[in-house]
Swiss-Prot record:
One of its GO terms (cellular component) is periplasmic space. This is Tol-Pal system protein TolB. It holds the Pfam family TolB_N. Residues 1-24 form the signal peptide. PANTHER family: PROTEIN TOLB, PROTEIN TOLB HOMOLOG. It is found in: Periplasm. Keywords: Cell cycle, Cell division, Periplasm, Signal. Gene3D superfamilies: TolB, C-terminal domain, TolB, N-terminal domain. It comes from Thioalkalivibrio sulfidiphilus (strain HL-EbGR7).
Amino acid sequence: MIPMPKMIRSLLLLFCLLPLGAQAALEIRITQGVEGAMPIAIVPFGWEGPGARPPEDIGAIIQANLHRSGQFSPMEQGRMPQRPTRGQDVNFQVWRGAGVDYVVIGRLVPAGADRFNVQFQLFDTVRGRQVTGYSIPASSSQLRRAAHMASDIIYQQITGVRGAFNTRVAYVSVTREGGEQRFALQVADADGHNPRTIFRSRQPILSPVWSPDGRRLAYVSFENRNSEIYVQDIDGAQRERIASFQGINSAPAWSPDGRRMALTLSRDGQPDIYVMNLADRSLLRVTNSRSIDTEPEWTPDGRNLLFTSDRAGNPQIYEQSLSGGQPRRLTFDGRYNGNPTLSPDGRLVAMVNGDGGRFRIAVLDRQTRQFRLLTDGRLDEAPSFAPNGSMIIYATAGRGGQGELAAVSADGRVRQSLVLQEGEVREPAWSPFLD
């Protein structure tokens, strides 16, 4: 893999990746959690139907989700003092004595042909009361999603922050077949399960980005030996080329309302930022300079764009109002700052910070101007916020330079590694909320 930041790579239209093995689900490993994480017990869910229970282990999925967040320390099943499936059987004193603050119990109840109700309750053992309880209808193919929905509810009830377990991640993988590389744009659940291929190509795929409604992806494809921007439904039903101008077509970014797209074009000379009206394909030129301007990112109100520019000599991040005026420089820490992505509330800017030959993920608070490095890798790039703003997924160079995905919390306290059993993955993009 070529050790250069994403901005330079994309502008040179290079995309060098090592050959991969077979595609598989991403395995998520917790490498650092919050000190003093919340003690919680997810009691194995009961099965109230005849015969064998469905294969999905609802309780295990919820436990894995909460553990993966880094905010919770789930009790091992072998240490649980009791295994109730009904609220009246929960002994608060016993659980408090075991050092558990919250208990989740539940059951899977048949509700007709291939229909089930995932019923669960969350209890606060300190206060000795039920916090919440839900019944989620699902078919057998939807049980894993129901477990993610339950995880979101539990997470929000305890932390006050909406959970992001029932979301998806898009990424690019590469395989080698018959001595040639094969590129694939894939979408998986946020926990790495259920990977699906959206598009395959013999040529590189770059910069996938989700539409605000979570139904489409925009990305850059080189299938016609030139960079072009496409929009595709995630179910594969429709695919449309929206930018194929002479020169560079790169870095698509949906507006918050989904009606416009910011992109980088070199049709008029140097790479500049443009905004396309997706209804009539009309273009508004946002920047016009002799520098390289790229990697646009919308503010949540749709009024401003952040972008990367080398107009000061080295790549730095700027903010430009769409109503006009001069761009304002935002970053001053390090020789390189690029690939800006905003938290959903618009307060934090995640970016790639380069200094001393290393590229790491950092965040800048737009209100306080506080700058913080979050990662310590050699080549970390392509940050993307979870829709609740709690985590940032990014690409990194793993052992031997192999490309992996990783995630870090916005405060740097929680770290995860997302690894294919064989191969390499790049270009992550976290979906918006899907419900």
